[in-house]
């Protein structure tokens, strides 16, 4: 870290579950100075996040290229994946938002996202991101275009865009790893207050039914 996110950053330490992990940047930010400061602190790559504007993200890719830094992270919701690849994207995490790029109406839902990102309802960044995912993720998966997706994946491979799949995240709600006592035993390595919260939370969540969307997202991810 830190994550480099947009002005409506997700991890800003204000909402529960979203600690202070990010830097918020926009078109008015001196992005090169920010990148130089990260390099001075030992950064060897940049991790970008979903609420960056397309213009700011493309600017960061350009700066990173000049400084021989790879850029990885979540694909910003504001940009088409192919455009990001062509501009120098170096990696992706959790295959996040690949589903949006593989939909047969990818261009249409990109325009919808760009409109939503104007945030007419003044939502926090974390809530706005969740809203967009809820509106588009399963619509995109339902509109999967296999031929389009193969082209996108081949373009990722041809440009050496590495994947950090971390499929545990994508299947957490369907596979319910935390329902296993052996899994919960690993919480002993957490700070005491977190141990209790995680343990109670795991027990409670394990009682909930696996939703149809949980299974759909697992199948898509795997």
Predicted regions located by residue number:
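Metal-associated gating/positioning segment near the N- to mid-region
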Residues: 1, 15-20, 29, 82-88, ...
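Glycine-enriched alpha-helix->loop->beta-strand junction motifs that scaffold or abut catalytic
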Residues: 42, 63-69, 86-92, 160
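Hydrophobic faces of well-ordered beta-strands that scaffold small-molecule active sites
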Residues: 4-8, 46-48, 71-73, 91-94, ...
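Active-site mouth loops of central-metabolism enzymes
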Residues: 15-30, 142, 214-215
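Active-site environment of divalent metal-dependent phosphoester hydrolases
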Residues: 12-13, 48-58, 76-82, 98-101, ...
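Active-site neighborhoods of metal-dependent hydrolases
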Residues: 34-45, 52, 98-222
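Alpha-helix-loop-beta-strand connector modules within alpha/beta enzyme cores
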Residues: 1-10, 57-74
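Short, acidic/polar
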Residues: 20-37, 75-82
């Amino acid at each position: 870290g830190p994550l480099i996110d947009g002005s409506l950053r997700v991890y800003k330490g204000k909402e529960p579950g979203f600690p202070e992990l990010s830097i918020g940047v926009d078109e008015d930010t001196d992005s090169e100075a920010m990148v130089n400061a990260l390099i001075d602190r030992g950064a060897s790559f940049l991790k970008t996040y979903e609420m960056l504007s397309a213009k700011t993200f493309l600017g960061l890719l350009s700066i990173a290229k000049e400084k021989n830094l790879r850029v990885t992270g979540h694909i910003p919701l504001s940009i088409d994946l192919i455009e990001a690849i062509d501009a120098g994207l170096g990696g992706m995490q959790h295959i996040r938002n690949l589903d949006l790029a593989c939909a047969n109406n990818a261009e249409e839902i990109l325009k919808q996202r760009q409109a939503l990102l104007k945030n007419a309802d003044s939502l926090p960044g974390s809530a706005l991101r969740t809203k967009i995912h809820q509106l588009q993720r399963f619509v995109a998966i339902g509109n999967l275009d296999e031929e389009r997706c193969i082209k996108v994946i081949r373009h990722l491979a041809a440009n050496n865009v590495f994947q950090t799949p971390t499929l545990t995240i994508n299947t957490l709600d369907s596979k319910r790893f935390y329902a296993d006592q052996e899994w919960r035993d690993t919480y002993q390595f957490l700070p005491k207050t977190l141990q209790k919260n995680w343990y109670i939370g795991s027990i409670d969540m394990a009682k909930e039914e696996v939703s149809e969307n949980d299974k759909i997202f697992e199948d898509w991810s795997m």
